[in-house]
Each structure stands twice: as structure tokens, then as C-alpha cells.
Swiss-Prot record:
Residues 41-265 form the Radical SAM core domain. Its cofactor is [4Fe-4S] cluster; [2Fe-2S] cluster. Catalyzes the conversion of dethiobiotin (DTB) to biotin by the insertion of a sulfur atom into dethiobiotin via a radical-based mechanism. The lineage of its organism: Bacteria, Pseudomonadati, Pseudomonadota, Gammaproteobacteria, Alteromonadales. PROSITE patterns: RADICAL_SAM. Belongs to the radical SAM superfamily. Biotin synthase family. [2Fe-2S] cluster binds at C100, C131, C191, R263. Keywords: 2Fe-2S, 4Fe-4S, Biotin biosynthesis, Iron, Iron-sulfur, Metal-binding, S-adenosyl-L-methionine, Transferase. HAMAP family: BioB. [4Fe-4S] cluster binds at C56, C60, C63. It comes from Pseudoalteromonas translucida (strain TAC 125). The gene is bioB. This is Biotin synthase.
Amino acid sequence: MELAPVRHNWTHSEVKAIFEMPFNDLLFKAASVHRANFNPNEVQISTLLSIKTGACPEDCKYCPQSGHYRTDLERERLIEVEKVVEQARLAKQKGATRFCMGAAWSDPKDRDMPYISQMVKEVKELGLETCMTLGMLNNEKAHELRNAGLDYYNHNLDTSPEYYEQIISTRTFQDRLDTIGNVRDAGMKVCSGGIVGMGEQAADRYGLLMQLANLDQQPESVPINMLVKVKGTPLENVDDLDHFEFIRTIATARIMMPHSYVRLSAGRNAMNEQMQSMCFFAGANSIFYGDKLLTTENPDADADMALIKKLGMNPETRHDYSDEAVAASLSSQVADKATSKLFYEA
């Protein structure tokens, strides 16, 4: 019997009941669902590169890349295709199977699309799964990216509809849903999640998950970020999120979206090994690997490989690798930790 069939009609009361289960019961249920759908001892390794940094016109209160706030961020133009491919090649050598490219835009402009499309094509030629996050997408640009071969498009809902206007005013919640719809219409996979710890209530955390799970097709990838407070942003002094609340969010996401990858994204630098291992037990099965995540710190690559080894886990391998030698080397990298830093990653 399937422990958690995919549903798209979750109610507020149902999700609340799951989120508020006794902690041990919640983790047991989430771990059971995870084991029924994934290898519990594999973790997907993704790398995220910032291809254009800062000066974003949006006013997301959590984001140091917003042009509305004074942070110490150095702005960078769209980087050259050749540099992106170089970093993707390094990522593959370090064990990544998925390469994500992010640009601090409200939406990509027509003049940038040829460069963006070329990045996708050349990264895919390396045998890597590709993902981009470029802001809002209309239907035409979504199809253009799909024609270039893009596998995933990331566009987070960020928080619940009820709390959304407390965080962002320059684009609506419906704008985000429309972009996800355009991505689906073009035939790409969806990566969509949110951020917790922005001063929201528990109802907003499970309300976000309800929105994601009730989409016509659930996201194939669900990144759950814990807020990284950055000086100069409006949320720099918000109260810390209780770590058990974060783990509850991971577990509830796993139960509600049993076939999705649940990714530990931003905020891992503030999580000790015990907390991260509990998240893996609760159903998280993907991480961003490397020393930086956009403009914020991420755990050291060596530390990640050491933790994966300590837990007896392995990096997930892709079956369609063009270079079998690289695929075969991933497990050995867990035993022989990477000895050099990755690179600037978004």
C-alpha cells in the first residue's frame, strides 16, 4: 500500500494536523514515506552559480541582491558563457549531477536570451541536469528556454499567500503562480519552495506547503530555505526560527509531496550535523554543495562530504551520464573528501 499517495486537494485542517503531530510520530511518518519513494541513503548534489549578481529591482525583504537595500554586496554583470561552462565542468568533477544558474533579475530581457540559451546548451553537453532561476517568465521565454534544453526552472512561492505581502510588494503571489504555469506549459520541470524564519507563523509555513502540494502538478524539486539574515535587509533583526520548526517543515513537505526532491537550501551554515542528519531522516534528499549560496555562506564542501560519509550516505548518480568514469567516482569522493574549494556559487 502506498504510504502517501500524491494529492492536490489538501485542506488547511489536514495540513495543520500533520504539522502539529507529536515530533517522533511526524518524523516516523515522513521517514516511512521517504523510504517508500526514494533511496534513503542517497542525496542529490546540486551546484548553484550566480550568473548575474545584485541590483535586482524587486524588493524581497530577505534578499541582499535587492537594489532597494544597502548591503555589502558587489554587483556583477551577466558573466560570459565560457566562464559558466568552466564552472559547470568543475562542478561535475566535484560530484554535482545538477547545475543551477541564477540571475538577479525581475525577468530576463530579450537581449539576454541568446546568452542564456547558449549556457543551457553547453552545460547540458557536459551531461549535467540544468536549472535556472531568472525571475518571472512569460510563455514565450519559457518555451525558448525549453527549446534550449533547460530541464528545471526555479521560481519559489517564498511563503504563504496570507503572509506574502509582508515580504514582497513588487510582484504578486499570482505573478509567481503564473510563472510556474508558463514553465509547465513549456514542458519543463518545476523547482519551487520557499523560505522559513522570516517572522511568519507556523500556519504560514504549512500554508506554503499546501500551496505547493495543491498545484496541478507538484514541483519535482522543493527547496526549503532557512532565512539567512543579512545586514542591510529589512529582516536582519528578525527572531531566529526554532530548529524543530524547520525540521517539522521538512517532514511535512516530504509527507505532502512524496515524489518530490526536498532540498536543504540556504541556512545550512547555521545547522549543526545533528540537525542536518535529522532533516535527512525526515525526508530531505538534496543539498546545494559549495562554499557559497548566492551571496550567503554555505557549509564547506569538505564538511559536506565528511557528513555524508559519517551518515553512510552516497551522492546520487544520474543514469544518463555521458562520462561513466565521473559517475563511478562520486562514491569514492565521499571517502576521499574534496580538498579544494568549489568556486563562487549562487
